[in-house]
């Protein structure tokens, strides 16, 4: 760390067999010499040769090899907080500000200058917030889901720790908060950190870690939400309802400063009730979500879809009308991207029109929807939402009624 700048930045990360990201990640963290003064990497079990590959990545962008700090540790059992803490503790004593990233993430050019600027302007800031794009459009590159993020803090010696075995979070001691009582924010005109995940990466250990988190921290409401959601991802709908209802009861007694927690939980419960055929409970949950947070779009979309499938088209269109009048897009990690996509709304309208016997109008809606499904991610989400089954159902109905064809879909989609 030979740079003469007053403010020293350390990036720290954990990794295992992620060499496909080395070149991009190192270039991003170095940022032509304007980014990190030090890059600390804790390897958790990569195959041999990972250090040489990282050195080669540094050479490509003229980053001195001595700016790396390497360590390796194998964890059994695995938990993210332990690895994060060990990687954080690799930073040098001269470090002023730390930022944690993963190797499938990219900090945009200019991040180092911006971080130094905001920290120098707010010398008592203990946390620095910035916009983080969790997902992006594969064709346009535009962010689909983004929200404020804060994995940036002062030196851990002042009292910083990662907590929870999964979906780990930074926590700070009282002494740290007294020393650094304020927060700072990087310019909101940019999304500073972008996530480009490896879609082949297994999440097989997540459920066990979430169950462990619930066991270790039974009062942790976010952990309970993550657990209920993970059960739903795996099709374990009874478990989702069990844990989601438990969390809902806690939220009724112990309010938290999070306006989306309860309405998002109602949507999660409604989706699981729908999967097990509990229609009344499903509809109740969506309605409660709308009452709690009238601008939250997800509940409107889910309720409208449910009403369309239940042959209640007039109510479906009324909910869609309310959605257009009331919903406001907020950037939160619980938002589902396709709730704001045109294809989803046209799918719902087509379903409702089919029940009304207006098949030609339904076909128009479905054609418009098909035109909005463009990327592999769109196709995956459309499959998840039974889009192609609905299109084929309409196609069959039109053939039977009018002898026409529409909505041709690829049988492999």
Regions of interest found by a model, annotated:
Residues 10-33, 38:
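Short, well-formed alpha-helical segments that are part of the catalytic scaffolds
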Residues 28, 35, 39-58, 75-77, ...:
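A conserved acidic beta->alpha catalytic loop
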Residues 81-88, 107-242, 252:
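Catalytic-site signature of metal-activated, phosphate-bearing donor transferases
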Residues 85-97:
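Active-site nucleotide-sugar/metal-binding loop of Leloir-type enzymes
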Residues 213-217, 248-262, 327-338, 375-382:
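Flexible helix-coil transition and linker loops at the boundaries of alpha-helical arrays
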Residues 223, 257-258, 265, 299, ...:
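TPR alpha-solenoid repeat register
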């Amino acid at each position: 760390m030979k740079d003469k700048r007053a403010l020293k930045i350390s990036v720290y990360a954990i990794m295992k067999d992620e060499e496909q990201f080395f070149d991009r990640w190192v270039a991003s963290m170095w940022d032509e010499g304007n980014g990190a003064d030090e890059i600390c990497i804790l390897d958790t079990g990569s195959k041999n040769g990972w250090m040489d590959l990282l050195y080669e990545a540094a050479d490509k962008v003229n980053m001195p090899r001595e700016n790396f700090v390497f360590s390796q540790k194998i964890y059994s059992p695995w938990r993210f907080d332990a690895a994060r803490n060990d990687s954080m503790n690799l930073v040098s004593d001269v470090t002023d500000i730390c930022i944690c990233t993963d190797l499938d993430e990219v900090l945009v050019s200019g991040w180092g200058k911006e971080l130094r600027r905001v920290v120098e302007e707010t010398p008592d800031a203990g946390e620095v917030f910035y916009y983080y794009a969790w997902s992006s459009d594969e064709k346009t590159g535009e962010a689909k889901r983004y929200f404020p993020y804060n994995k940036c803090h002062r030196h851990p010696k002042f009292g910083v720790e990662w907590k929870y075995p999964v979906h780990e979070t930074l926590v700070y001691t009282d002494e740290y908060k007294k020393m650094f009582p304020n927060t700072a924010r990087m310019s909101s005109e940019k999304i500073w950190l972008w996530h480009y995940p490896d879609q082949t990466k297994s999440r097989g250990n997540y459920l066990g870690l979430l169950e462990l988190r619930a066991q270790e921290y039974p009062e942790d409401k976010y952990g309970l939400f993550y657990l209920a959601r993970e059960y739903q991802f795996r099709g374990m709908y009874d478990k989702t309802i069990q844990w989601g209802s438990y969390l809902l009861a806690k939220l009724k007694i112990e309010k938290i400063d999070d306006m989306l927690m309860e309405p998002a939980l109602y949507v999660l419960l409604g989706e699981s009730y729908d999967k097990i055929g509990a229609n009344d409970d499903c509809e109740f949950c969506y309605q409660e979500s709308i009452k709690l947070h009238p601008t939250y779009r997800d509940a409107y979309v889910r309720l409208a879809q449910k009403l369309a499938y239940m042959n209640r088209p007039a109510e479906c269109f009324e909910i869609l009308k309310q959605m257009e009048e009331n919903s406001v897009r907020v950037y939160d990690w619980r938002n589902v991207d396709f709730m704001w996509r045109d294809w989803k709304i046209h799918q719902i309208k087509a379903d409702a029109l089919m029940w009304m016997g207006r098949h030609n109008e339904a076909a128009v809606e479905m054609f418009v929807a098909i035109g909005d499904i463009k990327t592999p991610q769109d196709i995956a989400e459309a499959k998840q939402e039974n889009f192609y089954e609905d299109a084929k159902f309409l196609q069959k109905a039109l053939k039977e009624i009018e002898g026409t064809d529409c909505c041709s879909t690829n049988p492999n989609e």
